[in-house]
Regions:
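Predominantly cytoplasmic-facing regulatory/coupling regions of multi-pass membrane proteins
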Residues: 1-48, 117-238, 290-307
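Alpha-helical transmembrane segments of multipass membrane proteins
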Residues: 103-107, 187, 217-218, 240, ...
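Conserved mid-sequence domains
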Residues: 229, 233-244, 252, 264-267, ...
Length: 307
């Protein structure tokens, strides 16, 4: 790492900022489609806070979305369920381009190198996701009203229990819970029905993934490792799957997968580890630190009183 080119290192962090901005603009597009008047730069800051929540809670987005929804509702002036629908929509749309990019990389390498066991596993994972994600999306959408009813049945006793345990909070009624769950699904329907907004959000999501791949590629280049760009297109999306591990932000799991795949693709062990450290410092540590400060402001009583 000490031998890394400082100019290229600066470019890594600049690209990381571009990634965060692109996905923040994706959030802005979704919120605008839901009737929020939030400004683009504010949405980027809010997304940084949401990224902090994802990075410090287990299971990545699944653990951070409820907290991120609170930040969104406070800053965008929306109901909590609308904020939850917005961040859930953004995270779902963000996931789609990763499958396509990883598929492009896998196809490229199938014509260039023979697959070892690790590359075969990566290709199987990408293929499984390419099939499973569209199928689950179609099934979930076709049966969304049943899913909504099931969500109400599950949420009602849980919310009632929390309401009894938390001091100075009365348990919500079943009608209030049903209204909020319906509001969440109604917001999801509004997002899915806005084709122009979906296309724009998808474009920002794709740009963000390209920035992430570029960050890893530049991290390798800073260490004197010149690799084909499709290497990053394969490694970054597959590594993101490790973000679902029960560790904050997938910490440890993501790094292990990234290093393993880079080594399988011919990068020396030491260079792979150093490049991943640089890449994750720019795309994990930096947004966690910056997003944590923003989250502190959004969560403060002063902000709540002024909003």
């Amino acid at each position: 790492i000490r031998r890394a080119d400082p100019t290229v290192l600066a470019a890594v962090f600049a690209v990381a900022v571009c990634w965060l901005s692109a996905w923040g603009l994706a959030l802005w597009t979704v919120l605008s489609g839901l009737g929020s008047s939030i400004r683009a730069h504010v949405a980027i800051l809010v997304f940084a806070a949401a990224t902090f929540a994802n990075n410090v809670t287990p299971f990545g987005q699944a653990g951070g979305e409820p907290v991120a929804a609170l930040f969104i509702s406070r800053s965008a002036g929306t109901e909590y369920e609308t904020g939850l629908a917005a961040i859930a929509s953004v995270d779902s749309i963000n996931f789609v381009p990763s499958i396509g990019l990883a598929s492009v990389g896998i196809v490229y390498f199938s014509t260039q190198v023979s697959f070892g066991s690790r590359l075969q596993f990566a290709s199987y994972a990408v293929a499984a996701l390419a099939i499973a994600v569209p199928v689950l999306a179609v099934v979930g959408w076709n049966y969304r009203y049943r899913v909504e009813a099931a969500a109400v049945r599950v949420a009602t006793p849980v919310a009632s229990l929390v309401g009894r345990v938390v001091p100075r909070r009365s348990p919500p009624t079943a009608d209030a819970i049903r209204s909020r769950v319906e509001g969440f699904f109604h917001a999801i329907e509004r997002v899915s029905g806005n084709r122009r907004g979906l296309a724009l959000t998808f474009g920002f999501a794709l740009l963000g993934w390209l920035c992430l791949a570029t960050s890893l590629w530049l991290s390798l280049f800073a260490l004197g490792q010149t690799v084909a760009y499709p290497v990053a297109l394969v490694v970054v999306p597959v590594g993101a799957i490790a973000g679902a591990t029960p560790l904050p932000g997938g910490l440890g799991g993501v790094e292990a997968v990234l290093i393993t795949l880079l080594v399988a693709l011919g990068v020396p062990n030491g260079a792979a580890a150093a490049a991943v450290i640089i890449h994750r410092t720019a795309t994990y540590v930096l947004p966690t630190v910056v997003g944590g400060g923003i989250a502190g402001v959004l969560g403060s009583d002063t902000f709540a009183a002024g909003s």
